[in-house]
Amino acid sequence: MALQLRPNCEYCDKDLPPNAAEARICSYECTFCADCADNELHNVCPNCGGGFERRPIRPAIERRPGVCVTKQLPSDKRVHLKYSVEDVAAHCARLRDIPPQER
């Protein structure tokens, strides 16, 4: 199963196309732009509490059969935070000084 490529930052709603180098994901594939992940969320996923990594870029060219962005399409469903900005800020403040591997 291919990684789900969500089309937007869940915090600021910025478009994050499949080839966006600034897309960040947590281990549950929650998706945020680098600016929000670093400056608003402080490397704390507001949904699970985990950290973020760069989202891999799916190849645009089919170099192996069936393996490219046109054969395994990105999601077109926009996802938004389930929590208030205030709740997210408090959640991130509680966890930001704990390394992701210890959360």
Q: What kind of region is each of these model predictions?
A:
Residues 1-103:
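Intrinsically disordered, low-complexity regulatory regions in eukaryotic proteins
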